[in-house]
């Protein structure tokens, strides 16, 4: 499969993305000797994982992304029992960060990610690594935008990076304990 989205200098359109074909995973793992397998079940890189046209809207008008393809994950898990599965592009794009960015001069309309309950479900299955880099970037950006909005005369990175580091720590702690099921597994 191929993930849609943008990461570094690589861009894959939604039209060019595809889901993992479970019938191909055993041969792929055997031929490559990989020690984990990143599969495509509907995740996407970046903070704009889905276009508004790919989503529905709830009663409040908030975008609701399409569900992940757990049928693909379950079939891959049956074919590769116990094999470590990875999900790239799995940031939840917390709306609190998006709202804070927008409130402090940012422009991130319709940024949406993977719902935490779906990530929690994936972590309970055979997924052992869930990549959430965009959530880290959003935590940092929201904190720094808020800081400079409240302290426009400051310029010392030690001042604005301190709350940014704390925002990342808090978000990662929440994800590890409440979403990814990593608490006590170090």
Model-derived segments and their meaning:
Residues 1, 42, 89-91, 135-137:
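Short, ordered loop/turn segments at secondary-structure junctions
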Residues 1-84, 95-100, 104-112, 116, ...:
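Alpha/beta enzyme core
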Residues 86-90, 128-129:
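A short beta-alpha structural unit
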Residues 103, 114-186:
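C-terminal alpha-helical cap/extension of soluble enzyme domains
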């Amino acid at each position: 499969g191929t993930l849609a989205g943008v990461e570094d200098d690589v861009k894959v359109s939604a039209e060019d993305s595809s889901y993992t074909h479970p019938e191909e995973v055993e041969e792929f793992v055997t031929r490559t000797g990989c020690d984990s397998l990143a599969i495509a079940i509907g995740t996407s890189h970046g903070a704009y994982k889905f276009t508004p046209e790919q989503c529905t809207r709830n009663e409040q008008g908030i975008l609701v992304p399409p569900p992940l393809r757990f049928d693909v994950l379950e079939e891959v898990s049956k074919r590769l029992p116990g094999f470590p599965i990875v999900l790239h592009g799995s940031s939840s794009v917390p709306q609190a960060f998006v709202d804070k960015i927008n409130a402090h001069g940012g422009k991130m309309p319709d940024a949406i990610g993977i719902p935490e309950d779906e990530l929690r479900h994936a972590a309970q299955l055979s997924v052992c690594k869930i990549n959430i880099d965009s959530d880290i970037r959003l935590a940092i950006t929201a904190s720094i935008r808020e800081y400079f909005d409240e302290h426009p005369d400051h310029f010392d990175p030690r001042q604005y990076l301190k709350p940014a580091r704390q925002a990342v720590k808090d978000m990662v702690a929440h994800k590890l304990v409440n979403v990814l099921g990593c608490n006590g597994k170090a």
